[in-house]
Regions:
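N-terminal targeting leaders characterized by basic, low-complexity, disordered sequences
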Residues: 1-30
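Short, flexible beta-strand-to-coil junctions
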Residues: 23-26, 201-205, 314-318
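Juxtamembrane low-complexity tails/linkers enriched in Ser/Thr-Pro and polybasic
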Residues: 34-48
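Hydrophobic membrane-insertion alpha-helices, especially the h-region
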Residues: 54-72
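Ser/Thr/Pro/Gly-rich low-complexity linker/stalk segments immediately outside membranes or between
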Residues: 75-91
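Short extracytoplasmic
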Residues: 89-122
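Extracytoplasmic beta-rich ectodomain segments of secreted or membrane-anchored proteins
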Residues: 125-254
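Extracytoplasmic/luminal low-complexity segments enriched in Pro/Gly and acidic/polar residues
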Residues: 257-343
Length: 343
């Protein structure tokens, strides 16, 4: 073998050695076969998925308390929640005849930047207060939806009032045609009952003057106040204007704004109107009529004083029948009736 051949043989051996060493090195670095490598890759993928899930759950678990805390802070700062509750409750007192609330019957449920207010409403019929339903109002941030009224009344107020369905009629407004049947309804009730009656007057009267017109066996519960718009009950845009009034009697519960401690009911009524004027956009949502024009009506009351055109009264049914012969009564609307509870 010549020298050239020997060199070529050495080169081949060296090349084979390098190949063998490279294969051995690769096998040392990658000791797993293809199946095992796929299993390892899949295990890595599963581990990554689990890690992502755990991270997502951790973020969600962190978001929930942060959102909850932020919501409570939102409603707490500036007294937003209390203000919304106060607007809702005071709207009932001055727009819903013979309707009242009780503090312990009001609930608030706060969600993510939302609040749901639920409160029971009561009527005095005879000498007892009866629960007659509940109102539920959902708020997204501080924007309320229309109230959901769940009432258990025989003769509930209309959801969308109009001149034809108004229970208390101004002396300058036309009396609805069906109103003549109300005296027949009252006469047809058993003597052993107490009733609620909406009385419309022939003329405007002062609150004290009106109360003197009723005997001791009839209790005046709510006074409908003339604010300059009740003759037509529509505003400049043709929207029905909500009636306004206030409780005639002192409510000695601490919850009621008409508790008689610092102001008489007329003064409280005026204060409430001015408070609601500052929150009129929200108040309109709560009221049945979709217009309030509070600024105009407050100015009218300041200039002309408080005069009433109607009242809600309650008492023994036989006593209420006597109102038919009263010269100051223009028309009536019979409300709720209960079994005898007059003492």
């Amino acid at each position: 073998m010549n020298k050239k051949d020997r060199n070529e043989t050495k080169d081949e051996e060296l090349y084979e050695t390098l190949i063998h060493d490279s294969v051995k090195e690769f096998e040392d670095v990658h000791p797993y076969n293809e199946k095992e490598q796929k299993r390892i890759i899949q295990r890595g993928k599963n581990s990554a998925i689990r890690t992502n899930i755990l991270i997502s759950l951790a973020v969600l678990l962190l978001i929930v308390p942060v959102m909850t805390l932020s919501t409570y802070l939102y409603y707490a700062i500036g007294g937003r929640a209390n203000n919304l509750i106060e607007v809702a409750s005071k709207t009932v007192y001055v727009t819903e005849p013979n309707m009242s609330l009780e503090e312990m019957e009001l609930e608030e449920d706060i969600g993510f930047f939302s609040m749901n207010i639920t409160y029971d409403v009561f009527k005095r019929i005879g000498q007892e207060d009866y629960k007659v339903g509940n109102y539920e109002i959902y708020h997204a941030f501080d924007k309320p939806s229309l109230p959901k009224r769940n009432m258990s009344l025989e003769r509930p107020l209309p959801e969308l009032p109009s001149e034809e369905t108004e229970y208390l009629v101004h002396p300058d407004a036309a009396i609805p045609l069906e109103r003549s049947d109300e005296w027949d309804i009252l006469r047809g009730l058993p003597d052993g009952t107490v009733s609620e009656v909406y009385v419309s007057l022939n003329q405007l009267m002062g609150p004290e003057e009106l109360e003197k017109q009723f005997g001791k066996n009839i209790e005046v519960r709510w006074l409908a106040v003339d604010t300059g718009v009740e003759a037509h009950h529509v505003d400049g845009e043709g929207l029905y204007v909500t009636q306004l009034g206030y409780p005639a009697q002192i409510d000695d519960t601490t919850w009621s704004p008409f508790n008689g401690r610092d102001q008489n009911n007329e003064e409280v009524f005026m204060d409430i109107l001015q408070f609601l004027e500052k929150n009129e956009e929200v108040t309109v949502k709560f009221a049945r009529g979709k217009s309030l024009v509070l600024s105009e009506r407050i100015s009218y009351l300041k200039e002309n004083g408080i005069h009433v055109y109607g009242a809600v009264v309650t008492g023994p049914t036989p006593e209420l029948r006597k109102l038919e012969n009263s010269p100051f009564v223009r028309s009536i609307k019979v409300g709720e009736v209960k079994l005898w509870n007059w003492k």
